[in-house]
Regions:
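Active-site loop/lid in soluble adenylation, ligation, and acyl-transfer enzymes
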Residues: 1-55, 59, 63, 67-71
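Short coil/turn segments at secondary-structure junctions
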Residues: 8, 96-100
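Catalytic-loop motifs flanking and including active-site residues across diverse enzymes
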Residues: 16, 20, 82, 109
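Long, well-ordered alpha-helical scaffolding segments within enzyme catalytic domains
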Residues: 101-110
Length: 110
């Protein structure tokens, strides 16, 4: 199994957080990476293909000081507020130690 890098980038705005995830996902990471981060200010991150203008009220977000950003990955809108977020970038073979599927990935990371 490859040696994992653990990165804590602290609290940053949504654009910075998504830019780091994008760079890591584009293969800049030569070894598996587990990244921890926080959001300051709070943000709504929308999935890559999501039409968020239908589901996220940008006027309310603006009034509350909540950023709206797009994730480089799929999924739905997620509100990030007073939380610790993590991302994993690796070759799927780096997760085999914990077993198959999402549960196996969580066991490997833990």
């Amino acid at each position: 199994m490859a040696r994992w890098r653990v990165i804590d980038t602290g609290a940053n705005d949504g654009a910075y957080n998504m830019a780091v995830d994008q760079v890591l996902a584009q293969g800049v990471a030569k070894s598996p990476v587990l990244r921890f981060y926080d959001w300051d200010p709070p943000a709504v991150s929308c999935g890559y293909g999501q039409r968020f203008e239908r589901e996220v009220d940008s006027a309310v977000c603006s009034a509350l000081g909540i950023d709206i950003v797009r994730r480089p990955t799929g999924g739905r809108a997620v509100l990030h507020w007073e939380e610790l977020t993590y991302s994993v970038v690796c070759d799927p073979r780096d997760l085999n130690g914990g077993g198959e599927g999402v549960e196996g990935a969580h066991r490997t990371i833990a």
